[in-house]
Amino acid sequence: MKEYIIAQNQNIMRYHDFPGKETPILFIHGLGCAGSFDYPEVAAQAELVGHRRILIDLLGSGFSDKPDDFSYTVKDHVDYLYGFVYELNLQSFIIFAHSLGGPIGIELAKRCGDQVTALVLSESNLDPSSV
């Protein structure tokens, strides 16, 4: 797995980055899940293999750090993910977001604007303010 060091707090978010020449897909998992555990089989599907596939473990999940002093709000997740997108130089990408990842994906898409070419939500809470 790769590591992204979050500038604001020096915590480490871990992720898989599978190569592909088509539009990158950023997978944002839900509560009780982790990209490293729940999405490798999905990312291996023939229909997706041409895409660059980025499977993250949000802070507090999977192999990423689990800091006690992090608030775990949608906004705080979006803050470091926006930096992550910038660090990876994702000029154009797709967001796939599940469950709690949904409001995170919605807010990240708002912040990234035209960089996000599609937003796919699965079993998502559509109101970020309610999380």
State what each model feature region is.
Residues 41-46, 70-72, 112-113:
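Glycine-rich, phosphate-binding/catalytic loops in enzymes
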Residues 40, 82, 106-110:
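Short, hydrophobic alpha-helix immediately C-terminal to the catalytic nucleophile
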Residues 91-130:
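Conserved hydrolase catalytic core segment
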